[in-house]
């Protein structure tokens, strides 16, 4: 998975910018913006890597000697490092606007390597700065810009905005047999809308969302004039992919889940969001169909889902009523998924450092 980055301006964003000459060229001019250090620590824990990018007009010239810049800058970096704030890179353009160089913000020369394919997670990377040129840089990079201001968008607000969970994914899967559109919101509940053309299957998918504590919208157009095979199978593939994408870097998730009794049935579900697809399934049914859903397709659905989601899934149910047996499997999976996707911290739940 590609990396999340924050490209952060220096003067006026990390540290205060002197209004007299816009140069931090003496130690007494060095002052940190409020809450910048604790918020950057919080953002690092949330998985962001930090890159400083700054225009320093005329750096190295008589109007702004390098030595005058180096003292306060090095002290600033030492303070950041001593508090645990680590910048992967510090990118500096020393030119004046009149020089018409390639590296001055909002041009992208300094950040070209991050624009290579899959070098960064563009959907979750940001430019943070106090000037319009910082927002223009974000536009040129194809990422979101956040314009820092002590009153309207300060570091506390930025930290809250960037660490607030709203895990979402949208998957479209089109084949000759099916056209499927799936959206999932892992941190929202209710208002799920599901239409696969197979009524009982819709009801079962809704059980996953309801007991999983999340919202999803699924629309399927399948070759039901033949049977429900492709509709159920491809829905499982698309839903599994959407859940995997919505989980993102999996940082802070519980990872494991277990459960569930239902009426005369006892369903057991064990789930590990491991990155290793595997299904163990045991369920017997008296009839070939429950409503308009083929009972043989239930295992196929969970196998397809576990494959694209990348999870280890054990499912088992016993009971007397086919409807209850089927429903117990979907409810147990939903309830188990609720436990596993819940966020309880900010670390990756793996001794290997990867899921």
Swiss-Prot record:
A GO BP annotation: L-histidine biosynthetic process
One GO MF term attached to the UniProt entry: imidazoleglycerol-phosphate dehydratase activity
Record PROSITE patterns: IGP_DEHYDRATASE_1, IGP_DEHYDRATASE_2
Binding site for Zn(2+): 93, 95, 101, 103
SUPFAM superfamilies referenced in this protein's UniProt entry, alphabetically: HAD-like, Ribosomal protein S5 domain 2-like
Cofactor(s) needed for function: Mg(2+); Zn(2+)
One Gene Ontology term, aspect cellular component: cytoplasm
Family membership noted in the UniProt record: In the N-terminal section; belongs to the histidinol-phosphatase family. In the C-terminal section; belongs to the imidazoleglycerol-phosphate dehydratase family.
Protein name: Histidine biosynthesis bifunctional protein HisB
């Amino acid at each position: 998975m590609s990396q999340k980055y924050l490209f952060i301006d220096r003067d006026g964003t990390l540290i205060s910018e002197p209004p007299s000459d816009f140069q931090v060229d003496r130690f007494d001019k060095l002052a940190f913006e409020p809450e910048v250090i604790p918020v950057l620590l919080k953002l690092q824990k949330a998985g962001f890597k930090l890159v400083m990018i700054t225009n320093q007009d005329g750096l190295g010239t008589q109007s702004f000697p390098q030595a005058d810049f180096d003292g306060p800058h090095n002290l600033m970096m030492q303070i950041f490092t001593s508090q645990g704030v680590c910048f992967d890179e510090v990118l500096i353009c020393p030119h004046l606007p009149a020089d018409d160089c390639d590296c001055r913000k909002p041009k992208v020369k300094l950040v070209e390597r991050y624009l290579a394919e899959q070098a960064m997670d563009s959907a979750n990377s940001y430019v943070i700065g106090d000037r319009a040129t910082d927002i223009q840089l974000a536009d040129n990079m194809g990422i979101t810009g956040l314009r820092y201001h002590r009153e309207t968008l300060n570091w506390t607000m930025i930290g809250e905005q960037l660490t607030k969970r709203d895990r979402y994914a949208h998957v479209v899967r089109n084949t000759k047999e099916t056209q499927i559109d799936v959206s999932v919101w892992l941190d929202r509940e209710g208002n799920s809308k599901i239409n696969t053309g197979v009524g009982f299957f819709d009801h079962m998918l809704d059980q996953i969302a309801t007991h999983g504590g999340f919202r999803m919208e699924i629309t399927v157009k399948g070759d039901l004039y033949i049977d429900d095979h492709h509709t159920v199978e491809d829905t499982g593939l698309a839903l599994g992919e959407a859940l995997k994408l919505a989980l993102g870097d999996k940082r802070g998730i519980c990872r494991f889940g277990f459960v569930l009794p239902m009426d005369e049935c006892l369903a057991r579900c064990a789930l590990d969001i491991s990155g290793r697809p595997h299904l163990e399934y045991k369920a017997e049914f008296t009839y070939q169909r429950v409503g308009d859903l083929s009972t043989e397709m239930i295992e196929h659905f969970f196998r397809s889902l576990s494959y694209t989601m990348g999870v280890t899934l054990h499912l088992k149910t016993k009971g007397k009523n086919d409807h209850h047996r089927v429903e117990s499997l979907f409810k147990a999976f939903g309830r188990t998924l609720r436990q596993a996707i819940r966020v309880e911290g900010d670390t990756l739940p793996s001794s290997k450092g990867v899921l």
